[in-house]
Amino acid sequence: SDSARAKLSQEVLQTLVAENADIIAIQETKLSAKGPTKKHLEILEELFPGYENTWRSSQEPARKGYAGTMFLYKKELTPTISFPEIGAPSTMDLEGRIITLEFDEFFVTQVYTPNAGDGLKRLEERQVWDVKYAEYLAELDKEKPVLATGDYNVAHNEIDLANPASNRRSPG
C-alpha cells in the first residue's frame, strides 16, 4: 500500500531489523485466538530470520481479535515463557495482555495495558488492573531484576501522543 500509515509501518519494521535487538516486544497485535497466520509467520521469518516468536491473543469470552502481545527474541536465547494472569477484572486476563520471559539473571515482561475506555467506562477496572500489575511486577522483582516493557496507555506529555490536540481529553 502507498498510504502514509503503510509507509510508516514499513519504516518501523526496517528500523527494528537494523537495530538487531536481542528482544522485541510488540503490543496490540490483534491476532486471532489461533495466533499468527502462515503469511504472518512467513513475513516474520523473512524480516527476522534469526528470531523465535511467542504470542498471546485474546481468548473467549474476551473479544476476538482484540489486544494481544508478541515477543520476538534471538534464537540463541532460551527463556522460560509464561502468560501470567494477574487477577484482573472482567475479561482483562483473557485479552492477551502480558507475556513474561524468564532468563537466569532477570525477567523481561511486556504489557498492553487496557485503557479506561470512552467516557471512562472502564476506569474502575483500569485502576484495579494497575494495582494488580504493579503487584505482579513486585513479586517478580523479589526473585530477580525485571525489565518491564510495553504500552502502558499513559501519555505523560504531549510528545507521547500522535495527535495531542485531538487526544487532550481522551482516556488512557
Regions found by a protein language model. Name each.
Residues 63-81:
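Conserved beta strand-loop-helix elements of the APE1-like EEP
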Residues 35-37, 50-52, 91-92:
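Short amphipathic alpha-helical surface micro-motifs
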Residues 51-60, 87-89:
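Class I S-adenosyl-L-methionine
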Residues 19-20, 47-51, 104, 143-144:
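Structured helix-beta-strand junction loops
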Residues 49, 66-68, 97, 104:
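Residues that flank catalytic or metal-binding motifs in active/ligand-binding sites
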Residues 11, 75-172:
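Active-site regions of metal-assisted phosphoester/phosphodiester hydrolases
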Residues 1-45, 55-66:
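N-terminal, active-site-proximal structural segment of metallo-dependent hydrolase catalytic domains
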